[in-house]
Every structure is written in structure tokens, then in C-alpha cells.
A protein has these predicted regions:
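ATP-dependent carboxylate-amine ligase catalytic core
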Residues: 2-4, 10-12, 16-18, 26-27, ...
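C-terminal lobe/tail of nucleotide-utilizing enzymes
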Residues: 5-8, 12-13, 45-62, 272-372
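Extreme N-terminal, non-catalytic leader segments
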Residues: 90-152
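Flexible, glycine/proline-enriched loop segments at strand-loop-helix junctions
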Residues: 102-106, 154-162, 199-204
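Conserved catalytic-core segment of NTP-binding enzymes
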Residues: 107-109, 113-115, 128-129, 133-136, ...
Length: 372
């Protein structure tokens, strides 16, 4: 079926608050007919986000139906992932209008008696993107089985919602344009929506998070030389660090890309948690990975959406100078500095007979950022 999404983001359609909507608009705009947000009605996605062209923002379901959608997409990923109670009636009305429902919330809509009953009555389907498979095993370090043929790159970050998924998707597209055999391993509901497969690891029972990550990498590595794993959370996040560590331990990355926002000095919604200087954070991040596999941070991806061009270029130059690592904003600018670092790292692994560059560095005193 050719999906035609009407995206529900009422009161939340912004560069940071509507993550699922924004990714769908950026990477699959051909499937989006309109966005519902009465506070932005009359504008376009381009006006609100800086991309998305003429996709309209409308004030109601009735107005959105003019675009002939066949599905309603829940366009937000709020803290806790719960369905806003005020949205229930609109979703039920959308089902009455024969729209399938796509949701990435922790609230599993197909388990809700009212939604399930209405779906049966109207003949529509509910797609819960965060519903994990029920046969995930614990991690057993099996990613080591692909060490002789694939390089695993994990995005990590100083906070949530800072660009870990977007960075990997930008890298995926640009690397494929270069002819690389690269795969993106989605670990969250929005990545699953864009890519069409994956596991939302934050919905997995804690004991099996690493196992889910392991499973994703093994699947992605079947037809790829480089696996780009979507990171989640942050090692210093007071709410979500458990998912972050599960991904590190399960995906066993060979190297990491650090994602940061130059203007963000504290964890969002937790202002008491200050973000350390980037060089210090890199040392902490590498130390977190080291017990299972030394994995250096080899490049920095900045999110400069809230800076003008001069400020963004200045931030890139400053971080490059301070860390000694290739740095760019892979959305705003050319992602080539990060891609070049990944390709050089991948080549070096196999030039060393399969030994990781991280191991070589560790023997010589640690990663470049740690020496700085």
C-alpha cells in the first residue's frame, strides 16, 4: 500500500518536540500529506522546520482529510511515551474515517480495549512501532562473529534528542552515494518507521536490551561492510542511561560518533545534570565501552539547528580544534569529514589483520581525544 500519512503533532510541531514527524518529513516526504497542529495552522513544514517544502500544517483532522491520507501517524515521542489523553477522540475519529493508525508511543494502542474494538469495527489496522518481538535472547557477545568482515559504528550523545538517529541516516545516504555497502540498524520507533525494520530497544525488558542490539547488528551485517547503529540516550542521562549502556554492550561497536549540541549545557528536563566539556565526555564515553571492546570516538556530529550559519561554522571549527577530531553538522553541512573518518577506520582495521584500531591505540596510550 502506498502510505499517505496525516501526521498528528497537535501543539508539539517544533524542531525538537516532534521527532517522529520530523524524521518522516525529512526522509520520506513523499508519504506525508499534512501535519495537524492548530497552533501552527496555515504554515508549512518548511516554515516550521526549515525543511519539508510545501507540506501544509492544518488545524484539524477534517482539514487534513483534504489531502486524501490513508493513515494517521502519531508524530511525537514525549518523555515516557504516553498517549496525550486529549488525542484519544481524534484518533478514534480517524479510525472512523478509515485511516490506519501508526504509533511509536510506549502506550501500545492495539492493547487498548477501545482502540482495538474500533479497529475491528472499522476494518483499520493499528501499527505499534514500539512493540518488540517476544523472542529476544540475552546478549552473548555474538557481534564478534562479524569482526572479520564488518565494522560497527555506534552514535552516542551528550543527551537525548540530539541527533544520533539523524546523523546515522545522513551518513547512510551519503555513504551509499559513494558506493559503500552500508546498513542502518534502527533501535527506536522513528528509525523503524523510516527504515521499515528494527527493534525499539527502550521497549525491551532490561535484561534483553543488549540482546536486541546484538540481534540488530547481526541482521544488518549480513549484507554490509559497515553497520551504522542508531544510538539512544546518554551515559549521563538520569532516566535513560540504562538503554544507552545496553546498546553499547550489545552492539559491541568498533568505533563511535559523538553527537552534541554546542548550545546545550545541561540535560533537557534535568537542568541539575550539567553536560561535561566535550573532551572529558569523550574520555568517559570511551571508558564506558572499553571493558567489552575498546571503541574510540572517531568523529563529532554537531546539531547546530539553533545557530546561524556563522555560529554553526564557528562551533564546528572550535570543536575540531578542541578535540582534534573531524567535526561537522551532517545535516547542515557536508557529512564528508565523518564519512572519511569512518572509511579510514574501517580500512585500518583490516590493514591490521582484523585487529581494531582501538586496540592499537590502547596499547599506545589510548584514543586521540583522551590524550588531548
Amino acid at each position: 500500500m502506498d502510505l499517505r500519512f496525516l501526521i498528528l503533532a497537535e501543539g508539539s510541531f517544533t524542531p525538537l518536540r516532534s521527532k517522529t514527524a520530523n524524521a518522516c518529513i525529512r526522509y520520506t516526504p513523499e508519504h506525508v500529506v499534512a501535519v495537524i497542529d492548530s497552533t501552527q495552522a496555515g504554515r508549512t513544514a518548511q516554515d516550521v522546520l526549515g525543511f519539508g517544502g510545501s507540506i501544509p500544517v492544518v488545524g484539524s483532522l477534517a482539514a487534513g482529510l483534504a489531502g486524501k491520507p490513508n493513515a494517521l501517524l502519531i508524530g511525537i515521542a514525549p518523555p515516557g511515551g504516553q498517549l496525550p489523553p486529549s488525542w484519544r477522540s481524534l484518533i478514534l475519529e480517524a479510525m472512523d474515517r478509515k485511516l490506519d493508525i501508526w504509533s511509536g508511543l510506549h502506550t501500545i494502542l492495539s492493547d487498548d480495549d477501545e482502540f482495538a474494538r474500533r479497529a475491528r469495527e472499522t476494518g483499520v489496522r493499528i501499527h505499534d512501532l514500539r512493540q518488540p518481538p517476544d523472542d529476544i535472547d540475552v546478549a552473548r557477545g555474538r557481534v564478534r562473529e562479524v569482526d572479520d568482515r564488518a565494522t560497527v559504528i555506534l552514535t552516542v550523545g551528550t543527551d537525548c534528542n540530539i541527533g544520533k538517529m539523524t546523523t546515522q541516516l545522513q551518513l547512510r545516504d551519503a555513504m551509499r552515494a559513494r558506493g559503500a555497502r552500508v546498513a542502518f540498524a534502527p533501535t527506536g520507533q522513528t528509525g523503524i518507521l523510516v527504515e521499515g525494520w528494527g527493534i525499539s530497544v527502550d521497549a525491551v525488558i532490561a535484561d534483553f536490551i543488549a540482546g536486541a542490539a546484538e540481534r540488530l547488528v547481526l541482521h544488518a551485517a549480513k549484507d554490509a561492510d559497515i553497520v551504522l547503529v542508531e544510538g539512544q540516550g546518554s551515559i549521563i542521562h538520569p532516566s535513560y542511561s540504562g538503554v544507552t549502556y545496553g546498546l553499547i554492550h550489545g552492539s559491541l561497536p568498533h568505533a563511535m560518533i559523538m553527537c552534541a549540541q554546542p548550545t546545550r549545557t545541561a540535560i533537557n528536563n534535568h537542568p541539575w545534570v550539567k553536560i561535561p566539556p566535550l573532551r572529558d565526555f569523550i574520555v568517559m564515553q570511551e571508558a564506558a565501552a572499553a571493558p567489552l571492546r575498546p571503541a574510540p570516538v572517531i568523529a563529532i556530529a554537531l546539531n547546530t539547528y539553533d545557530l546561524d550559519d556563522a555560529g554553526a561554522r564557528g562551533a564546528v571549527e572550535r570543536v575540531t580544534r578542541e578535540t582534534g577530531l573531524p567535526t561537522t553538522d551532517p545535516v547542515r553541512f557536508d557529512p564528508a569529514p565523518i564519512i572519511d573518518a569512518i572509511e579510514a577506520f574501517h580500512r585500518a582495521r583490516f590493514e591490521h589483520g582484523g585487529r581494531t584500531l582501538a586496540a592499537t591505540r590502547a596499547e599506545g596510550g589510548g584514543a586521540r581525544a583522551s590524550k588531548a
